[in-house]
């Protein structure tokens, strides 16, 4: 019996080593009950981090929360055809790998990303989606780039410290962006647009190269700089109440 227990111990130890080095040498603290469809990284004292999403997905859902000792957590449904993989460190790269061979696995799924509110984030959405939803209120963001196409891009941003650049290089049908009230946003429509609503202006047939600069933007110490180099159909800017708790 003792020999059998020893062999089991060796197998368990070997499995732990495989988990630790399976992706780019990055160790994952997964409990015995953890699903293969969940990946996380430890906070490890970091105050800032960059994330690049490199695999396309039907729906990408990103939010901010107090994760205590975790830097980020990513999940796909247990029945999804893919599972999340995290690699690298600067930036951290989120990709998707095959989730198994079960014929009933779904190809209509959401990749859910929860980011720690304890760090300042730089985000690059570099893979196409049908819909990207990112509610980043309650967090801190230094910059965002969307470099791949999306049917619907729906993003809520926190109050920035200084200038927060937002680069839109991937084509988008509907671009919905919610900003804190009282923070000016300059919008550069580099590729043209069918419709733009900034809250103070409603424009149709907007020519490429149009720059919409609100009063006070040039001297503001907290502001957004939205540069849409690619074309889009509709841009709607709304405002949320910064006095609300998120």
Question: Which residues are covered by each model-predicted region?
Answer:
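Membrane-proximal soluble helical/coiled-coil segments
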Residues: 58, 84-88, 119
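Hydrophobic membrane-insertion alpha-helices, especially the h-region
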Residues: 11-26
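Terminal targeting segments of Actinobacterial cell-envelope proteins
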Residues: 1-8
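C-terminal region of N-terminal signal peptides and the immediate post-cleavage residues
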Residues: 22-42
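Short, surface-exposed interaction patches in beta-rich subdomains
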Residues: 73-86, 90-107, 145, 152-246
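Extended beta-solenoid/beta-helix repeat architectures
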Residues: 116-120, 126-129, 136-152, 158-163, ...
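Extended, structured, electrostatic nucleic-acid-contact surfaces
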Residues: 36-52, 106-109, 113-123, 158-166, ...
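Short extracytoplasmic
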Residues: 41-70
